[in-house]
Structures are given as C-alpha cells and as structure tokens.
C-alpha cells in the first residue's frame, strides 16, 4: 500500500522542525497523518478569466477539510494572451506554460503533497497545470474558472452577440464609425471568465473533461453562474475520494496517468475535432502526452481528424453560438454522448466524475442530456447568462426556459446532421511542412478549402501587420510569417492581429496565411500554423521567396511550395553557407531577454508540442 508522500515531512522525531513549521501554517496535532492536498490556484487581477478566482481556493479547501484532508493553497502566474497580443508581451505567453508546469512541480514536490486540485482557466494555465499533473502522477482534479458571458449590443436596430475578436475587427475596420467601434469594445467582454467563444482557454477546459480529469460542466458552465460553485466544492470532495482510493486501497486507477491514458487522449482529440477547438490544443495535448510518457503524436491527430465530423460550431467559427449555448445544449457531455453513439470514442476509460472508480459510460448515462432521467442534470444545463457586467463569480442564477436538445438544428448536432462530415481541425503536410502543420477547418470558408496563391513573405508578425494595413497584401496572396516558432521567435507568438486585420480589410476569405508561429483560438479563415520544422530549425518555410506559388488543399491534407527540388536544394545550400547568420531573420529588431533565450535554447518545434528537448537534458 502506498505511503502518504507527506509522511516524509510529518513523521519521526527528525522531522520536528518541519512539523513545527506545519503547525505555524495552522496544522493541529490531530491533523498529522491526514493527506495534504495542494491547491494550485491562478488568481490574478491582470486576467478576466482569473480575476474572480481569489476565493475559489478557500471553497475547495473547505470541502477537502470537511472530507478529512489538510488543504494548502499556492498560486501560479497567469498571462492574458489577449492583453499580451500584438506586442513583445506575446513572446512570453507560451514559455509561461513551462514555468507554470515547473512551479506546480516545485511546490508539490518540495512540500511532499499527496494530491492536487488545479484551479485554472486561461490559455497556458490549464495546459501548464495539466503537464505538471501528469508529470507528478498524484491524484488530481481540475476545476476552471469558467467562460464569460457573450457580449451583446444593439447595432442598426439589431441585437448581436459579441466577443473579443469582434472588438478587434471593428477597431481595425475604417468602415466602422468611432462610436460603433467604442460600443462594440465596451460590450464585447462583459463579465469575468475566459473569453466566450471556443478559443484556447475554453477548448482546453473542455478537453480536461474528455481526458477524465475534471467534472461535467467544467468547460461550459458560466463563471458568473451560482451553479459553478458546486464544481469547486465537488472538486475538493472528489480529490479526497481519489486520494483514499490510492493511498488506502492501493488503487492505481485513481492516478492521472491511468485516467488520462492513450485512449483518453484519443477521446480528447476526437472531442477537439468535433467541436472545432483552438488549434493550440494540438500543441498542448502533444506536450501533455509526453509528460504522461504516452506516445501520442501528430500522426494520431491526423488519423483522428480524418474520421470525426464537426458536431458543434461555436464562435469564432459562427456568430450564432458561444459557450453559454454549448452549455445549454449539454456541454462536453452532450458532444461526447453524440460521439459515443457514433462509435467514435472509448467509453470504458476511467473518469473522476464516475463513482467508485467507474468509467466514462456511467458518467454519460448520468450527464448526457439525451440519456439522463435526472431532473437535476437538466436543471444544471439550463444555467444561462444574466447579461449584467460583473467581475464576481456566482453572481447570478438565470436559467433558460429549456435545454437545447435539438440534434438536427441546434448548437450540438448528431453525426447524421453534423455541420460537416469533415472535422474542425486538420493536419496538413508537404514540402512546406515536412513534419506537419495545423489548420482550424471549422473557421475556413468552403470556397477556400483549396487555394493557390503567391507568397508574400515577412520575418516578423510586426512587419506582416504593417504590410497588411499598408496595402502590400492583396487578394490571392499567401502571407508567410516565419521565424516566429518556439525557437525562432522565441516563444511562438499568436497571430491574431494579422488574421484580424485581413478580415478588417475584406481579405479574410481572399488570402491565406501560413506561419511557424501559432494562432489564437479566436482566429478563423485560411490560417495555417505550427509549420514544422520551423524556420529557425531549418524548415522549408525559411526558403520561401516572394512570388513563389503555394498550393493548399485541405481535403487532400496537403500544403506544397511549387518550387523544384533542385531550386530548393540550391536555396538551402546558400542558407547553410551563411554560417551563424543562416536560418535567422535577415532584418528584425527585437529585444530577447535572457529568460526567453533560455527557453529558446531547449525549445522543440510545434509538432513535438514546443516542449523542452529532453535529449539535451538527458545527455
């Protein structure tokens, strides 16, 4: 039977000093011997998705202590990608994922915690905590802060739904008046919570449900709704159940690596494709799988993407539906239920929401609104928005008159009535991206599924933005933004501003954009990221010249530079001949701190999850 990890610092006379310090934190005599549960919170006043999390750790702690544990909370950093977007701050976003993973590991291992609750929400925080949880492999439950309500405003006598991207597009569109732009800006992000569409934060919080590590509703229940309180309380109770199963009953199925198995990673990717999740999820799932020592690669993602239909279409791919609508339609469990009926997921995998070590099938039987007979579950998924601006969690208790169980015309569809039989994400490959690249097909206009255009090359996001706004980019161009990968950026910036500005200039469906950087979950259009190998690692994207023809064929999963192999060999030889100046941007002024240089030194390309190159660490 496994011994409590915390016994290392709480048992024996030689640990008198450690016990004295534990006592100074509030631990009582009769508490020693209880499991110590770490609560990794990520509260910050910088980020709307985290601004309401200050007291969430106390909620979870109360449930843990009531169930017989010792709860100890600490905090991680959290970067807001939207605020960091479009300037040097974005260089720090992806590297912050590794810092978060490391900080959770440091705190948990330094203090010998027995189990973990991760309170996350936004873009890099959930992935960083997920990497840490799988690295540590102690009982864990994830609970996020939840999505914000969709913005709403009246323009031209019509009520429209809004999100962050709408504010960005309006701000860059000269055809939108200053008054309308300001009105959209004021209305786009009305409450606390992660941005209201199927962007990276909400995508990742949904995927933790599919991985089996969070409770139903984690990805879709609004941050403002009173019902979300129960998710935090139940997370505390559930982690204690998992700890008891492992430490008292030697049940290894309570550990995250046995819950988030290869099958569960497949389930998560199937869900991702079906709901048209952010392309960043590919990066994070591959990274997390490596921490779990699971061989889950781009080849698996490519295989899955060819089999799974698009069952749930949400902003930014449509203005009609936001996360509040996904929740009304049954949330992640509603989508998984349809995927289960289509025979596309494994329902025999463990799940933290299952009682007594049960599986996903039992969870779906209770929480899929098309299966359940429980009126409390229907009530849970009827939780809706209040439309009142606030930074407070649990501030309202509004409900829809009914849930959306229309699988023919609703927010979530059955396989028969899918938005498309092609899924929402695809892996492309060809001489531009020998190791693959990612496109969010859910956001691509049908007329652009095949595209041939002339390369317009930029060696930084800043230059690309200037070129787009300055009129250099014209209809039919393929905008190439390179040296923005994990190593070359460094930090693999998101390219939301270039894609947004293409839309604002009426070029959103008339141009393509490819990059070794990545895209915000708010991106739509023919935007292809994660090109691997990246330019700084000798990728072909570094050899593209202005005017080269690039052919993109999403149905055939192909991206090809129409230049002869002989010419490419000549260009590669010339690049190699530059020595230390080769495979670097020709003209780019960018300050790179020592912290970012340290990240770049070990960073792998996107197809490996942009994680540290372990071969350099393991000799």
UniProtKB/Swiss-Prot annotation:
Domain of life: Bacteria
Pathway: Amino-acid biosynthesis; L-isoleucine biosynthesis; L-isoleucine from 2-oxobutanoate: step 3/4; Amino-acid biosynthesis; L-valine biosynthesis; L-valine from pyruvate: step 3/4
EC number: 4.2.1.9
Cofactor: [2Fe-2S] cluster; Mg(2+)
Swiss-Prot/TrEMBL catalytic activity: (2R)-2,3-dihydroxy-3-methylbutanoate = 3-methyl-2-oxobutanoate + H2O; (2R,3R)-2,3-dihydroxy-3-methylpentanoate = (S)-3-methyl-2-oxopentanoate + H2O
Enzyme class: lyase
Assigned keywords, A-Z: 2Fe-2S, Amino-acid biosynthesis, Branched-chain amino acid biosynthesis, Iron, Iron-sulfur, Lyase, Magnesium, Metal-binding
InterPro entries: Dihydro-acid_dehy_C, DihydroxyA_deHydtase, DiOHA_6PGluconate_deHydtase_CS, ILV_EDD_C, ILV_EDD_N, IlvD/EDD_N
Family from the record: Belongs to the IlvD/Edd family.
Function of the protein: Functions in the biosynthesis of branched-chain amino acids. Catalyzes the dehydration of (2R,3R)-2,3-dihydroxy-3-methylpentanoate (2,3-dihydroxy-3-methylvalerate) into 2-oxo-3-methylpentanoate (2-oxo-3-methylvalerate) and of (2R)-2,3-dihydroxy-3-methylbutanoate (2,3-dihydroxyisovalerate) into 2-oxo-3-methylbutanoate (2-oxoisovalerate), the penultimate precursor to L-isoleucine and L-valine, respectively.
Subunit field text: Homodimer.
Record's protein name: Dihydroxy-acid dehydratase
Organism: Shewanella frigidimarina (strain NCIMB 400)
Lineage: Bacteria, Pseudomonadati, Pseudomonadota, Gammaproteobacteria, Alteromonadales
């Amino acid at each position: 039977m496994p011994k409590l990890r915390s016994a290392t610092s709480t048992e024996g006379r030689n640990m008198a000093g450690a016990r004295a310090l534990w006592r100074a934190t509030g631990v009582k005599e009769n508490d020693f011997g209880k499991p110590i549960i770490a609560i990794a919170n990520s509260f910050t006043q910088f980020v709307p998705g985290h601004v309401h999390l200050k007291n969430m750790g106390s909620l979870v702690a109360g449930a843990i202590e009531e169930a017989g544990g010792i709860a100890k909370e600490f905090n991680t950093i959290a970067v807001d990608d939207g605020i960091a977007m479009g300037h040097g701050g974005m260089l720090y976003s992806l590297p912050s994922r590794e810092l978060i993973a490391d900080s959770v590991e440091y705190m948990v291992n330094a203090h010998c915690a027995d189990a973990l609750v991760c309170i996350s929400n936004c873009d890099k925080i959930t992935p960083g905590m997920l990497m840490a949880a799988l690295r540590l492999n102690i009982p864990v439950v994830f609970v996020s802060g939840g999505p914000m309500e969709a913005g709403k405003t009246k323009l031209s006598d019509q009520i429209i739904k809004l999100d962050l991207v709408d504010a960005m597009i309006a701000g860059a569109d000269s055809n939108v008046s200053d008054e309308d732009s300001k009105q959209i800006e004021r209305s786009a992000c009305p409450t606390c919570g992660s941005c209201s569409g199927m962007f990276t934060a909400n995508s990742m919080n949904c995927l933790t449900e599919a991985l089996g590590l969070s409770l139903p509703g984690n990805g879709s229940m609004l941050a403002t709704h009173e019902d979300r309180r129960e998710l935090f309380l139940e997370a505390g109770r559930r982690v204690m159940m998992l700890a008891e199963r492992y430490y008292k009953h030697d049940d290894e199925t309570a550990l995250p690596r046995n819950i988030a198995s290869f099958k569960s990673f497949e389930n998560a990717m199937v869900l991702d494709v079906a709901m048209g999740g952010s392309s960043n999820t590919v990066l994070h799932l591959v990274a997390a799988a490596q921490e779990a020592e699971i061989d889950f690669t781009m080849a698996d993602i490519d295989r899955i993407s060819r089999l799974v239909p698009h069952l749930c279409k949400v902003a930014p791919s449509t203005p009609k539906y936001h996360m509040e609508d996904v929740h009304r339609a049954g949330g992640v469990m509603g989508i998984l239920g349809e995927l289960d009926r289509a025979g596309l997921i494994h329902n025999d995998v463990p799940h933290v929401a299952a009682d007594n070590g049960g599986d996903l099938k039992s969870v779906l039987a209770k929480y899929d609104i098309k299966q359940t007979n429980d009126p409390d579950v229907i009530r849970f998924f009827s939780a809706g928005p209040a439309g009142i601006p606030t930074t407070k969690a649990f501030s309202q208790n509004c409900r829809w008159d009914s849930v959306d169980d229309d699988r023919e015309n609703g927010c979530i569809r059955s396989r028969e009535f899918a938005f498309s039989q092609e899924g929402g994400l695809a892996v492309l490959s060809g001489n531009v991206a020998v190791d693959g690249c990612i496109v969010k097909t859910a956001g691509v206009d049908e007329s652009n599924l095949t595209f041939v255009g002339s390369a317009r090359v930029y060696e930084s996001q800043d230059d690309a933005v200037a070129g787009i706004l300055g009129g250099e980019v014209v209809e039919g161009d393929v905008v190439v933004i390179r040296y923005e990968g994990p190593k070359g950026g460094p930090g693999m910036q998101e390219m939301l501003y270039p894609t947004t500005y293409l839309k604002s200039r009426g070029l959103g469906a008339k141009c393509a954009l490819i990059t070794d950087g990545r895209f915000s979950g708010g991106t739509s259009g023919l935007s292809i990221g994660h090109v691997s190998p990246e330019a700084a690692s000798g990728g072909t994207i570094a050899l593209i010249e202005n005017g080269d023809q690039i052919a993109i064929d999403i149905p055939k999963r192909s991206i090809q530079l129409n230049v002869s192999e002989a010419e490419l060999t000549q260009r590669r030889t010339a690049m190699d001949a530059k020595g230390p100046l080769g495979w670097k941007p020709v003209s780019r002024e960018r300050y790179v701190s020592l912290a970012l240089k340290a990240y770049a030194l070990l960073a792998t390309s996107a197809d490996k999850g942009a994680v540290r190159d372990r071969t350099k660490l393991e000799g």
